[in-house]
Every structure is written in structure tokens, then in C-alpha cells.
Amino acid sequence: MFQVYTKQPPQRFNETIDKKSEKYKILKMYINKGFCIFSFPYMDTYFDQQQNKERKDPHFNVRWHSITKQNHLNHLNLNDTAFAIVTGELSGVTVIDVDDRLEYKRMIKNNPKLKDYFTVQTNNGYHIYCKYDSTIQTRTDALIDYRKTDIRNNLALAFCPPCEYTLLNGKRVKYKFLGGKILKFPLTLKQNLKQFHEPRSNEFVIYSK
């Protein structure tokens, strides 16, 4: 969805702000790590009747496919409540998106070193940040042995702290950085990737020029 946000005047990242705030600290960390981060006004959710589940509905005010390392800070508004990184080569990361906490626990049990990885807690699961791997495709339901696990690489986004939004039941969701380092994509999980071609995730709209 493409909407223009006019509720508040833009407050850009390089303007005078409270540098002690958690919002500033997390954004500064993402920028220092070279992530191609940007913001958009807010995120809603809606109930998908066909899939029988609640889904995110990001209200973009930027055609994010046009965001680059050179211009992404121009699209970082501190008045916004929704934030994302362009994954893949632009940010130097390939993200494992586990949308089920039980599956994440099982994955950690089978791959204990994952506890050392840069990890973000989401509403239903976790994002595990790995060093960019050009041989891995963006895909949904990506692993053979783990359910509800997607790969966010080139031509994809990963919502990130300090992103927050409200569910239909009124619960407030806040993305939280848990710590860790950005390490090489685990070989055990790379070997577990499904090899057949799958369509890209339809969770995000990719705008054409």
C-alpha cells in the first residue's frame, strides 16, 4: 500500500534529537553496521480470510525498491513507527525469518551456535541475521525440516527495531534486538534449504518504476 504520511513534519535522523533514547541508539547501531534501513509511517494488520490468519499491512510512503545505500537516510523519519531494512547485498545480510517460537527453539537445539547470531525478536518468532550469501534465494517456507521459516535476501525486506504496531486484539508489538554477531550462514541450514523453485513471498509489494 502506498500512502503519503502528513500527520507530523519529518524529523530526519541527522537532526537534533535525544541521543540517549532507545530509538536513537538502535537506529544508530543499524546505521553503523551498514544496514540499508528506512522508515515508513506505520503498520496495520488485517485478517486474511483465505489463509485464516492475521497479516501485517505496511503503509509505505516510499517505493522501497528505489532505496540505496546513498539515499536511505533520506527516508529515515524519526516520527515514524515502522522500520525495515532492505536485506541482501544492500545491507550485507541474509536473514532467516522464523515465524514460530517452537520451531526456533527446535532449530536452536539442533544448531546451538545460532544463539551467538545477531537476533531480533518479532511478534511470533525471530529474525536471525547472517552474513550476506549471494547463493541463497529469497523464498518462503525455505527449509526442509523447519516449518514457517522464510529467507530474506535480495529483493526483500525485514522489519526491524524500533518497529512497532498494534494487533487486531489491541496487543502492542515491538521488535526487540536480543544481541549477537552477524556470522556466516550456518552450513547445516544451508544444506537444509529446499532446492526446487518457489515463488517469492507475497508479504511485501515490490513497486515497479
Please state what every model-predicted region is.
Residues M1-K209:
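Conserved phosphate/metal-binding and DNA-contacting active-site motifs used
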